Amino acid sequence: MKHDLETLKHIIDSSNRITFFTGAGVSVASGVPDFRSMGGLFDEISKDGLSPEYLLSRDYLEDDPEGFINFCHKRLLFVDTMPNIVHDWIAKLERNQQSLGIITQNIDGLHSDAGSQHVDELHGTLNRFYCNVCHKSYTKSDVIDRTLKHCDNCGGAIRPDIVLYGEMLDQPTIIRALNKIEHADTLVVLGSSLVVQPAAGLISHFKGDNLIIINKDRTPYDSDATLVIHDDMVSVVKSLMTE
C-alpha cells in the first residue's frame, strides 16, 4: 500500500491536466447512500412500496406529480450532507491549476459545494430545481427553507434538475466531459464501478499517460490502468496528504 501511495503521489505531482471521474463511493463518507449497494438508497426507496426505477422516472413525475415531489423531499434532499476530504482534495488540485475538472455520476452537488468550478454532472444535480411546467428555476435553499413543492409562478411541480429514468443525458454535458477526458494527461477514477452506461463508456476515450482507479471493488478497466488501489477513498486521500 505504501508503494502504491508513493506512486500515486508521484503521478499527481507530475501531472498538470488531471481529469477526475467520480462515482457514488466518493460521497458515502458524507452520508450520501450509494444507490445500488446493499443497504443503499435503492434498498431504502424500495420501502416506499414502488420500484426505485419507477419512483425516479419521468413516468412517475407525469403520472403522479404530487407523489413524485413528496418522494423527492423524503428521499433525495440530503439536507445535512457536507463535502468530505476527497471533495476538498479534488477542489484544491483545481485551485492549484493541476486539474481540468471533474466528471461525476453523482447528483449530490458536493463537488460544487467544496468549491470545484469545472464540474460536469452527468446525471444532473440536486443543487438546482425547476418547475416542471413553466421551467422557473429554484435553488436547493429555496426548496428546503420554504419546503417548496409547487411553483409560485404557475403552481406546477418543482422537480430536481436530475436525469430521471426515461430522460436523455444532457448532450452539452457529455461533450464537455469527453473534452476533459481527451485532453487529460492523467485520468483519476474515484468510487465508481465503471459499469453504468453510457457514462462509464467515456473512459474508453482516454488516451493520456496515466489511468488511476481507486475503488473498493474491481472494475472492467482495472487491467488497463497504470495504478489500481482497492481501498476506501477517504483513507487513501488522508494517507496521500500526509506523505
From Swiss-Prot:
EC no. given is 2.3.1.286
Check the record and name the Gene3D superfamilies matching this protein. Answer: SIR2/SIRT2 'Small Domain (3.30.1600.10), TPP-binding domain (3.40.50.1220)
Note accompanying the cofactor annotation: Binds 1 zinc ion per subunit.
Which residues does the record give as NAD(+) binding sites?
Answer: 24, 35-36, 105, 107-108, 123, 192-193, 215, 232
GO CC terms of this entry: cytoplasm
Keyword annotations for this protein, in alphabetical order, are: Cytoplasm, Metal-binding, NAD, Transferase, Zinc
Domain of life where this protein originates? Bacteria
Q: Where is the active site?
A: 123
The record places domain Deacetylase sirtuin-type at 1-243
Q: Which cofactor does it need?
A: Zn(2+)
Ligand binding (Zn(2+)):
131, 134, 151, 154
Can you state which reaction this protein catalyses? Answer: N(6)-acetyl-L-lysyl-[protein] + NAD(+) + H2O = 2''-O-acetyl-ADP-D-ribose + nicotinamide + L-lysyl-[protein]
Indicate the enzyme's highest-level EC class.
transferase
User: Binding of nicotinamide: at which residues?
Assistant: 35, 107-108
As one GO molecular function, the record gives: NAD+ binding
Alphabetized HAMAP family for the sequence: Sirtuin_ClassU
Which purpose does this protein serve, as stated in its record? NAD-dependent protein deacetylase which modulates the activities of several enzymes which are inactive in their acetylated form.
| Family stated for the protein in its record | Belongs to the sirtuin family. Class U subfamily.
Protein name (database record): NAD-dependent protein deacetylase
Protein source organism: Staphylococcus aureus (strain COL)
Q: Which gene encodes it?
A: cobB
